[in-house]
Amino acid sequence: MNRIDLPPPAAGGVVLSWPGKAPPTFPPPKAPRLVETFEPQRLVTLQSAPPANRLYYGDNLDALVHLLDAGYAGRFRLIYADPPYDSGVEWTRKARLRTTLPRELNGVVIEQPQYSDVWSPGAYLQFIYTRLPLLRELLAEDGSLWLHCDHRRVHHLRCLLDEVFGAENYLNTITWRSQTARGAKVNAFFFPHSAHAILVYARNRAAPTRWRPQRRRIELSENEAAGLFMRDERGFFRTSDPGTYSFERLKQLHAQGRLYAPYGGEVIVDEAQRRVYASKGGNLGVKYYLTSLGDGRYQVERGVDNIWDDIPGLGTTPGEDLGYPTQKTEALLERILNAGSDAGDWVLDPFCGSGTTPAVAQKLGRRWVACDASYGAVQTTVRRLQAVCQQCSVSASDSRGDAEGRLCASPEGFAVYAFDEMRPPQESVGKIDLAITRIEGQEATIEVAVLDADIPFARSLAAVHPALDWRAAVDSIAIDPAYDGLVFRAAMADAPLHKRATVSGRYYVRAPAAPTTLAVRIVDIAGGESMTTVRIEA
């Protein structure tokens, strides 16, 4: 597959041109190699086939071509694409020690390069233009594409989408308030840029496109509610026209105290005429009461339009901050996935960055594919997904799972693939001291204790903060209880998401009967990876 035919331009339509514009062409399919998996079910049984959810490390052009070649055409109900914005910035991830030290003593240890958003004239538009036809082919007939961008290129990207998807398949533009201007930005020249745009297109609007209206909950004080709603002895309420309600249904609503008569009138039920009406004229209304939250607070539900100012950006959601630039909040992706997909649907994110889309898809029961060309992004996504998978696998009565040494059933995990020409950075040179103990009476259970990790960042840490141990320099620990020497198949991971939380260092995992090779991999805060293996004979 070298080319994909685009729809013919509409009569009188607008076609965007730029220096070096060329028809989209694609490389031949390449076979990615399986790099690692996270399979919590391996705590119970070994699986031969890797999980269906997959993360690709490499150029997403190769990944998209591979997906089409592998039979994924028309499979994805929803595609969320958050490409570079042509911002002119070399983006980095800021890494800090995992410690409760005061912030002034715990500055940024390293800035890890993530991706370049600097483009030559015409290169940015050609980059996007080449990938859009592939996304269209992967999208289900009733699916939707959500392309996230900002003020710099939104006008150009809409023209490209019209050209590739057809202007008739344009659905809407979502305006998301991504930040609240503070400090000097408040007085920015011709107003601050506080919003992003999300362009929404259908594969075939006539299909029709999968769509589920969204609602949002709004909290009001008693004074706010009094200014917006009517009130009776039961509380604040709004009214709605009863429409075609039957006589019996109106009688039922009246018995429940849910009919409203205007002008101070009363509700009259005329059995002989089989009608319900207001004594002083006017139209009856059906009462819908606000939910009382106590303490003088009330909650009301309202429909969501295309102005999303109720979902905060990362700046006001610090608990989600992974230190990754351009990270999006989970609430944003929850709304998008809930609006355009159902549980069990396939979701694709070709620019996954910090992994918000696959993390939310995992929580919502969607199947997913994600891609990124930055190894730092892949590491961040893997760590995030490991934590999500283990959280999903633990019952409410055992909510902390393996970090406390408890075994639990798990959902499907995920697999990581890489294209041959894009290999991870060389593993950092380090020594991991382990203590392995089989639990008496539970021969299949192994206690793994990480006693020390002599990794480069831990050595640097000891020189600056002697009181801190190696855990402050570690982002995650993963364990493969049956390592085959080829693919690291983690059965459990300790991947704390809170920026100051540290790994436990003591774990219980199930392992197959001896002999087996147990592998432990540590990823430090700078992205360095160290692994050690232990052969268990009995």
Regions found by a protein language model. Give the residues of each.
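Accessory, often C-terminal, charged low-complexity segments
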Residues: 1-37, 41-48, 52, 69-73, ...
